[in-house]
């Protein structure tokens, strides 16, 4: 969950986000080790009493600093490609939801149901109830079942938007005339907040996304009440 003055990532709520957090830690450790080594070498170069330190010519050293970066890049690229393919793979989704971006709200359509669609607008600050989040609450939440694969189809009716929910590791561009897709699977129930992450006009900051992940039985009851 998120909290005020948070500096790190939100807690992972999907297998993809857990993989992304592990990859971030893996890459950050490599960057930290490289930075420490470079700073150590610079310090030695500045403090050594030896002369002609800038005219060294050693074939072995040049070979090492050519091969070593290639190995490091491979160690970063392989897990990155694995996650990339995992994010692109969608196997037998239980539910498909079509999302359309507008200036400046989202509309949703549950394509597996005959007449289940709605628009989702931000709740103005003056209408917020105690405990609700400013600029993040909507009048119609996207209710989805947890622990099942869900396919999101994302597009736009006017300008570029981006449908992003950080705790689920989701960020997909909404492009006019193009239908993008992504998959989500939540491992726990709750409310998950996101926002449009592509500058789309004067009210870009007022396009929140709220997903309400519930057990399958509650989702079925909700879908019946909405149709």
UniProtKB/Swiss-Prot annotation:
Cu cation A1 binds at residues 161, 196, 200, 207. GO terms for molecular function: copper ion binding; cytochrome-c oxidase activity. Residues 1-14, 88-227 are mitochondrial intermembrane. Binds a dinuclear copper A center per subunit. Its EC number is 7.1.1.9. GO terms for biological process: ATP synthesis coupled electron transport. The lineage of its organism: Eukaryota, Metazoa, Chordata, Craniata, Vertebrata. It comes from Carlito syrichta. Cu cation A2 binds at residues 196, 198, 200, 204. Gene3D superfamilies: 1.10.287.90, Cupredoxins - blue copper proteins. This is Cytochrome c oxidase subunit 2. The gene is MT-CO2. Its cofactor is Cu cation.
